[in-house]
C-alpha cells in the first residue's frame, strides 16, 4: 500500500512537470531593447489558443490606440486587444496562428513554444524572416 502511494505520487509529479501549459499571463520583453512592455494573457478557446494584452507597463502608453492597424483593430485601444489568434497545438509547439505587433500594425504568422516552465518563446515570421522574443511567466 505504501509503495503504491509513493508510485502514484511520483507519477503525478512527473506528469504535472511535463504537462506545462502556455495558458496564463506572460510579461513581454522587447527583443531589441530588453525592456518589459506588457502583460499578455494566453487562453484556450475551443481547440485554439489566443492572447490579449491585459496590461501595458509604460504608463504613458496605457491609453494608446492601434493607429497603424489595417484590420478591425484600427484605432482600437491596445489595452485589451487580442494580438495572438488561432494557434493550434502540435506536440510541444503552437503554430498556424497569427500575432499582431501593435507598434507597427503588422500581422505575422506565429509560432510559440515553452523554453522552460517560466519562459515562452514567441516567434513572428513572414516566410524565412522572423523575430523571436522570450516572454516570462507572470504571477
Predicted regions and their residues:
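Bacterial Sec-dependent N-terminal signal peptides
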Residues: 1-21
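Short, hydrophobic/aromatic-rich segments at coil-to-beta transitions
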Residues: 20-25, 90-97, 118-121
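Central antiparallel beta-sheet cores of small beta-barrel/beta-sandwich binding domains
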Residues: 30, 35-100, 107
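Short, exposed beta-strand-loop hairpins at the edges of beta-sheets
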Residues: 102, 109-113, 119-131
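Well-ordered beta-strand positions
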Residues: 43, 88, 113-114, 136
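K/E-rich alpha-helical interaction surfaces of small helical-bundle regulatory domains
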Residues: 21-35, 133-139
Amino acid at each position: 500500500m505504501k509503495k503504491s502511494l509513493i508510485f502514484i505520487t511520483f507519477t503525478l509529479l512527473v506528469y504535472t512537470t511535463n504537462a506545462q501549459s502556455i495558458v496564463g499571463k506572460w510579461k513581454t520583453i522587447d527583443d531589441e531593447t530588453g525592456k518589459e512592455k506588457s502583460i499578455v494573457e494566453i487562453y484556450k478557446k475551443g481547440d485554439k489558443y489566443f492572447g490579449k494584452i491585459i496590461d501595458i507597463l509604460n504608463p504613458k502608453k496605457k491609453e494608446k490606440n492601434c493607429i497603424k492597424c489595417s484590420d478591425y483593430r484600427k484605432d482600437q485601444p491596445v489595452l485589451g486587444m487580442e494580438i495572438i489568434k488561432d494557434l493550434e497545438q502540435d506536440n510541444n509547439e503552437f503554430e498556424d496562428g497569427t500575432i499582431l505587433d501593435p507598434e507597427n500594425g503588422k500581422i505575422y504568422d506565429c509560432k510559440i513554444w515553452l523554453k522552460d516552465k517560466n519562459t515562452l518563446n514567441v516567434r513572428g515570421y513572414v516566410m524565412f524572416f522572423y523575430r523571436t522574443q522570450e516572454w516570462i511567466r507572470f504571477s
